């Protein structure tokens, strides 16, 4: 069985277990154990943004991409982060004062971190695409339905050659 193989073979276990989720009283930590990234980070975008938002900035690091969307009228910002899950990196989410809800985003498991005051504090959604070894996160001053809809609209950027 797979369980027996994982117990006997560290190689099989490493290929199967790319991250561990650790739940604490005030936060959740995702610890990664994947290989170092080779090549460039894939570029993703939110394809269905709330009205008034447009991409303002894109920050590219070897294993991390952050896309900033700005609403010039309201001054509000939406962040889309994509992290390559590799050894030595982790993501930490504060759970103090928020409701944590398990969600499915396009078939992938994740968590939604909801605040009561989403107009002034960010709601956050995160999900993991284990096949591509990526963790996604959106932070925004929007309600539960809107942030989930945005997450479901995240797609690879279409590049023209």
Predicted regions located by residue number:
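Surface-exposed amphipathic alpha-helical segments
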Residues: 132, 137-161
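Short glycine-rich, low-complexity/disordered patches
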Residues: 29-36, 160-161
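Long alpha-helical scaffolds
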Residues: 1-2, 110, 151
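Membrane-interface helical sensory segment of bacterial ECF anti-sigma factor regulators
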Residues: 1-32
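Residue-level marker of positions within ordered structural domains that often coincide
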Residues: 21, 58, 159
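Short, solvent-exposed recognition patches
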Residues: 36-131
């Amino acid at each position: 069985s797979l369980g027996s193989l994982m117990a006997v073979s560290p190689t099989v276990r490493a290929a199967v277990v790319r991250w561990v989720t650790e739940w604490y009283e005030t936060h959740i930590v995702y610890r990664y154990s994947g290989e170092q990234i080779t090549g460039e980070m894939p570029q993703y975008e939110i394809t269905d943004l709330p009205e008034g938002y447009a991409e303002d900035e894109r920050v590219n690091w070897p294993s991390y991409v952050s896309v900033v969307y700005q609403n010039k009228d309201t001054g509000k910002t939406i962040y889309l982060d994509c992290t390559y899950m590799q050894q030595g990196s982790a993501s930490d989410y504060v759970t103090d004062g928020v409701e944590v809800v398990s969600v499915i985003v396009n078939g992938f498991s994740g968590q939604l971190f909801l605040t009561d005051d989403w107009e002034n504090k960010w709601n956050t959604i995160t999900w993991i695409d284990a096949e591509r070894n990526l963790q996604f996160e959106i932070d925004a001053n929007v309600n539960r339905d809107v942030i989930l809809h945005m997450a479901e609209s995240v797609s690879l950027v279409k590049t023209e050659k």
